[in-house]
From Swiss-Prot:
Binding residue positions for ADP: G100, G102, K103, T104, W105
UniProt KW Coiled coil keyword: yes
Gene name as annotated: kin-2a
Location relative to the cell: Cell projection, Cilium, Flagellum; Cytoplasm, Cytoskeleton, Flagellum axoneme; Cytoplasm, Cytoskeleton, Flagellum basal body
Domain of life: Eukaryota
Description of how the protein assembles with itself and partners: Monomer.
Entry similarity comment: Belongs to the TRAFAC class myosin-kinesin ATPase superfamily. Kinesin family. Kinesin II subfamily.
Entry protein name: Kinesin-2a
Pfam families in the record: Kinesin
Length: 718
């Protein structure tokens, strides 16, 4: 299995209106001939750190400047990967860069200038339509997004989908809808429908900032007969639009947008770690750190041809982000993948679809031959049409519904209702259509036979013309031979003269060669002496050149260290800022809890909470809540109510060995922040009893009333 490095290209967009208002400078130079990107550090960067900063140069597989167009990039860089998919390879194209760098424009574009995805669709179906007649294709499309580490189907529904893995299918999204398409327009409509459901939001960097990573997946199956054997190749095309990395200080994100940005940066950090580990050749690659890296596992170091398009901004205000993106891309180009052609996979759906259609056709023929009821024939016919259109295709390659099973059920049970005239007409139309098809086939056969006969007649006429031309040529050649006899005699005389002249020339050439050799020896001796004289000077010049080159390399390495140090410091500052926001929110929640929630209730809530490692969220366990309710109800049912001597307020005791006072509910409203409480609408038990004394109740009546109120509270809680 041959290895293939990830291809990396870089595209730079023009300065936008915001950067122009900020008087940002263009610090990017592109050398498309040598595929190099030169980054000129802005003046403020030089003065703020050190004056020795020099332009940085990065080399990639291809670079495209601000004047490049989507179609030109597709033809030069993306098209070979689409061709590889048709050959049975897996291919991945993904765009990476900071927010607002032009990733979505490169991948999607618009109607006037379509991007990589629509251009891929058009090229894909152009190749399919021009393929040989013995090739059959099945094209299936799916569209998903990764939003806040949750996978969602952008076409069928917006519910969370689980990510699973098995030995035969590898890593897959369970429940992701698959849609069979037959034209590029249908595939583009599928993409437009999903794109409308994608999460976007406005930030200070981008008015339509993508808040999720999206992957459009196209599966192409090709069935072909080679040497009387059917061969099925399955190619998979992943078109990935990554959300941009962003800094909160530049985007101004708050609230939900800030949380989205944190999740985006977290997944991109995991992607960067995977790339670093792959470049280092580590034994353990942390693909499981993020769902993004799990989805791209085959594309990074696996069975796939991968192209990364790094999008950068030319503005001097984005120098740090641009350098980070270029370093990211420079590491990625060192990753080696191991792509292979996927021949006869176990999950090939084109064979299963063909077998399913054949079974339905056999069932339809059997039903018509056995005189089945029109309703049953209609049911099988509808199932056959759905199978032909691919409406019953599932993710696992099975098919919804079984017409044969339904037919058997119809035979065993009583039919409900009579067949309608419309159903009978359907069967008759089906028979008429088959007869028309047979007639059309015979007509085509006669036309082909006629065409073949005409072709044979044309070939015979061509042979006759060729024979006439050949005879004429032979006559001309015979005349030429007769004329050449005299010429041959004259040539023999000339050959003798030329032989003598050639001998004289050879003698002169030998003398010339001897003189030339002597001259060459003298020149060699002279060059040797000259080399001895100049060797010291040349050696000195070479040493000076080596010293200059080494100094330049040292300066470049020092600058790289300084840039990385600055980048690290900025990252730490950004993390501190985010941590400060988190601490502020945590302190606010602590203050609310300490002020308004009793400590005992906080402890109970903490005991009931559980942390979900997969979703990274706290949740209240229903089982623990149920156990807590049952335990509290059990304790309440076993309570005893006593009245201390001289007091009308009850005290509650547990039965049995535990005779300690449990809770004095009459005093729960006291001592809250040592503030004067507002008068509540509902009084506590003790206060109500004090009020009842003013109505002239005796102690027994007060006791009965108190018990009724207490148990009504228990029933309400239960």
């Amino acid at each position: 299995m041959s290895s293939d490095n990830i291809k990396v290209i870089v595209r730079c967009r023009p300065l936008n209106a915001r950067e122009t208002r900020e008087n940002a400078l263009n610090i990017i130079r592109m050398d498309e001939a040598s595929a190099q990107v030169i980054v000129d550090p802005p003046e403020q960067e030089k003065s703020a750190t050190q004056a020795k900063k020099v332009p940085r140069t990065f080399t990639f597989d291809a670079v495209y400047d601000q004047t490049s167009c989507n179609y030109g990039i597709f033809q030069a860089s993306f098209k070979p990967l689409i061709d590889a998919v048709l050959e049975g390879f897996n291919s991945t194209i993904f765009a990476y860069g900071q927010t607002g760098a032009g990733k979505t424009w490169t991948m999607g574009g618009n109607k006037e200038e379509p991007g990589a995805i629509p251009n891929s669709f058009k090229h894909l179906f152009d190749a399919i339509n021009s393929s040989s007649s013995n090739q059959n294709f099945l094209v299936i499309g799916s569209y998903l997004e990764l939003y806040n580490e949750e996978i969602r189907d952008l076409i069928k529904n917006n519910t969370k989908l689980p990510l699973k893995e098995d030995k035969t299918r590898g890593i897959y999204v369970d429940g992701l809808s698959m849609h069979r398409v037959t034209t590029a327009a249908e595939l583009s409509a599928l993409m437009d429908k999903g794109f409308a459901n994608r999460h976007v939001a406005a930030t200070q960097m981008n008015d339509t900032s993508s808040r999720s990573h999206s992957i459009f997946m196209v599966r192409i199956e090709c069935s072909e007969v080679i040497e009387n054997k059917e061969v099925i190749r399955v190619g998979k095309l992943n078109l990935v639009d990554l959300a941009g990395s962003e800094r909160q200080s530049k985007t101004g994100a708050t609230g939900e947008t800030l949380v989205e940005g944190a999740k985006i940066n977290l997944s991109l950090s995991a992607l960067g770690l995977v790339i670093s580990k792959l470049v280092e050749g580590a034994t353990h690659i942390p693909y499981r750190d993020s769902k993004l890296t799990r989805l791209l596992q085959d594309s990074l170091g696996g069975n796939s041809k991968t192209l990364m398009c790094a999008n950068i901004s030319p503005a001097s205000t984005n120098y740090d982000e641009t350098m980070s993106t270029l370093r990211y891309a420079d590491r990625a180009k060192q990753i080696k993948n191991k792509p292979r052609i996927n021949e006869d996979p176990k999950d090939a759906q084109i064979r299963q679809l063909r077998d399913h259609i054949a079974r339905l056709e056999a069932q339809l023929a059997e039903a018509q031959a056995n005189g089945a009821k029109p309703m049953d024939v209609l049911r099988i016919g509808k199932s056959l049409m759905k199978a032909i259109n691919g409406d019953e295709l599932n993710l696992d390659g099975t098919f919804q519904g079984t017409a044969g099973a339904k037919l058997s059920e119809a035979r065993d049970g009583d039919s409900e209702g009579e067949s309608t005239e419309e159903e009978i007409v359907f069967v008759e139309d089906e028979a008429s259509r088959k007869a028309a098809d047979e007639l059309e086939a015979k007509r085509r056969a006669l036309a082909e036979a006629k065409q073949k006969r005409e072709s044979e007649l044309e070939q015979k006429e061509a042979l006759n013309k060729e024979a006439i031309v050949t005879l004429t040529d032979l006559k001309s050649q015979l005349s030429a031979i007769k004329n050449s006899v005299f010429v041959v005699k004259q040539l023999e005389i000339k050959d003798k003269v030329l032989g003598k002249a050639q001998q004289k020339l050879t003698t002169r050439q030998e003398k010339h060669n001897a003189l030339q050799q002597a001259l060459q020896n003298k020149q060699t001796e002279h060059q040797t002496k000259t080399a001895e004289i100049l060797s010291a000077v040349e050696k000195l010049e070479r040493l000076k050149a080596d010293i200059s080159k080494t100094e330049a390399e040292i300066n470049e390495v020092n600058q790289e260290i300084d840039d990385i140090t600055e980048q690290h410091a900025l990252s730490i500052e950004e993390e501190r800022r985010e941590l400060k926001e988190v601490d502020k929110r945590s302190a606010l929640l602590d203050a609310i809890i300490q002020t308004f929630i009793p400590q005992c209730e906080v402890a109970k809530a903490e005991a009931l909470a559980e942390y979900d490692e997969e979703t990274m969220k706290w949740a209240i366990s229903p089982e623990k809540v149920d156990r807590e309710h049952q335990m509290l109800l059990k304790r309440v049912r076993h309570m005893q109510i006593l009245y201390p001597s001289g007091s009308t307020k009850p005290v509650f005791f547990g039965k049995g060995k535990d005779t300690r006072a449990l809770v004095n509910f009459s005093q729960l409203s006291g001592n809250i922040l040592e503030l004067e409480p507002e008068l509540p609408e509902r009084m506590t038990v003790g206060e109500e009893m004090d009020g009842y004394q003013s109505y002239g109740m005796n102690e027994d009546e007060m006791h009965d009333t108190q018990l009724q109120m207490f148990y009504s509270q228990i029933d309400t809680y239960e």
